[in-house]
């Protein structure tokens, strides 16, 4: 008996910008495997950066103009023209240009009117500025996903396939639905085994998907759709494989796809900013025993990397070497610390006040050192800590990690340390828990890439 299995698949923005290849490599690759797949799509590459702010550099987008009450309507119209050009480029792929331009053009005009109304309400001073700005941010974010999802369904329909645009953005829908309720409501009359579904990566809900997840919202939508609809597998299509190291640092010829790992390893990666998937999106999948498959959209013959709950590598090995050079070592030295119960609790309370989570922590009799993100090492934090403790310093450093589902073998830590020493790299601090999934080395920032190459060469080759 042929049992129908549903897969929910996320396609990122960079991949969406190469949509003709996505059609060939993913959507229509196997004529016998077209349906039973729901695609959660991001905006085309760079569009959400223009709408909100650049994800990496922080360069302001339209949202910032609205927040500062500058000329956002002009920028919205410039963006509309850019989207019209993008639509034009998709005509050879099958896009109906008139329908596509009417759709996004109407939504941009409506968005400008809504933002103007918000502007007037903000000026009145009668409502919470924070709440209204969040609503404006979500409104803008939704435009990018609506555009790409509508276009995708339109293209497939014009190529002769039954396809459905699933709009989770809640535009012109005044019902007060939670995110889960909107997903259920939107899919209740859709049979994904008879139509190709393209759903927006943004979902409108009373709790505000960006309030907690901000730019990670599309992965949260992806996760929730997979759980609520009972998917057998959740697939993420990226422009690259999840590999044993960064090809730009280690070299393309020296790395390899991971192929299999577990959710614990995925958590370790997220902790240093190398997100295989947003940790708050992966948890519901892990709890519901839905495996995640990470695939390269442009290497369709490779099965990708499967992340499951219980996978343990059959032989002990390091699966990934990664890290971050955008971290600081926050060090608190205090002679009163020795033997005092709860001393570090006071430090944690100050970090919690500033909403800071640390990546790694090392202690001795009178010193506690934590690795935190550079952006969190603020003068305000240091001043608060300095008021309570004897000596507080913050030093720019790098963290390099050797991670695997099965690295608990005698000598592996020594081998890692020796590889760094052989390359004249001084270890400033080292950390590993008895669970033995992540060896963390703190090194001088200038030796970040060098340390990764040394560890990868010793542990992953």
Predicted regions and their residues:
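Positions that flank functional sites
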Residues: 171, 241-242, 300, 366, ...
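Short hydrophobic alpha-helical runs that function as membrane-insertion/retention elements
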Residues: 233-237, 292-294, 359-360
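Nucleotide/pyrophosphate-binding catalytic subdomain
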Residues: 1-277, 282, 442-444
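Short glycine/serine/threonine/alanine-rich loop segments
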Residues: 161, 231-232, 290, 356, ...
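A conserved active-site cap/scaffold subdomain adjacent to cofactor or substrate pockets
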Residues: 262-336
């Amino acid at each position: 008996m042929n049992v129908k299995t549903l897969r929910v698949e996320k396609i990122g923005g960079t991949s969406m910008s190469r949509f003709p290849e996505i059609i060939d490599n993913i959507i229509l690759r196997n004529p016998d495997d077209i349906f039973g797949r729901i695609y959660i799509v991001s905006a085309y590459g760079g569009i959400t950066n223009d709408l909100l702010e650049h994800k990496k550099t922080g360069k302001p987008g339209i949202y910032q103009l609205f927040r500062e009450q500058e000329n956002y309507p002009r920028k919205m119209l410039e963006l509309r023209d850019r989207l019209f050009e993008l639509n034009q480029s998709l005509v050879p792929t099958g896009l109906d240009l008139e329908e596509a331009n009417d759709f996004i053009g109407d939504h941009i005009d409506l968005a400008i009117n809504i933002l103007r109304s918000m502007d007037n309400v903000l000026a009145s001073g009668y409502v919470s500025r924070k709440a209204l700005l969040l609503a404006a941010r979500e409104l803008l974010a939704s435009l990018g996903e609506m555009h790409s999802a509508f276009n995708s369904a339109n293209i497939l329909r014009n190529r002769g396939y039954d396809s459905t645009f699933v709009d989770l953005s809640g535009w012109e829908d005044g019902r007060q639905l939670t995110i889960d309720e909107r997903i259920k409501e939107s899919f209740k009359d859709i049979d994904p085994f008879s139509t190709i579904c393209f759903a927006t990566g943004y979902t409108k809900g009373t709790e505000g998907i960006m309030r907690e997840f901000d730019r990670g919202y599309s992965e949260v939508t992806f996760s929730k759709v997979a759980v609520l609809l009972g998917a057998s597998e959740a697939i993420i299509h990226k422009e690259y494989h999840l590999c044993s190291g960064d090809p730009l640092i280690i070299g393309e010829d020296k790395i390899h796809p991971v192929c299999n790992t577990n959710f614990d390893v995925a958590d370790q990666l997220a902790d240093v900013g190398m997100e295989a998937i947003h940790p708050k999106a992966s948890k519901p999948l892990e709890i519901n025993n839905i495996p995640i498959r990470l695939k390269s959209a442009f290497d369709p013959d490779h099965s990708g990397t499967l992340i499951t709950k219980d996978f343990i590598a059959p032989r002990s090995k390091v699966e990934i070497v990664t890290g971050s050079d955008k971290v600081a070592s926050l060090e608190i030295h205090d002679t009163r610390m020795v033997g005092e119960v709860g001393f570090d609790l006071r430090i944690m309370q100050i970090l919690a006040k500033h909403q800071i989570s640390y990546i790694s922590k090392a202690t001795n009799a009178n010193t506690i050192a934590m690795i935190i993100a550079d952006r969190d090492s603020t003068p305000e934090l240091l001043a608060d800590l300095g008021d309570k403790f004897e000596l507080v310093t913050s030093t720019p450093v790098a963290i390099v990690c050797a991670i695997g589902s099965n690295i608990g073998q005698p000598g592996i830590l020594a081998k890692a340390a020796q590889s760094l020493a052989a390359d004249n790299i001084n270890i400033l601090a080292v950390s590993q828990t008895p669970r033995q999934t992540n060896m963390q080395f703190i090194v001088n920032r200038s030796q970040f890439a060098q340390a990764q190459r040394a560890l990868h060469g010793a542990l992953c080759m």
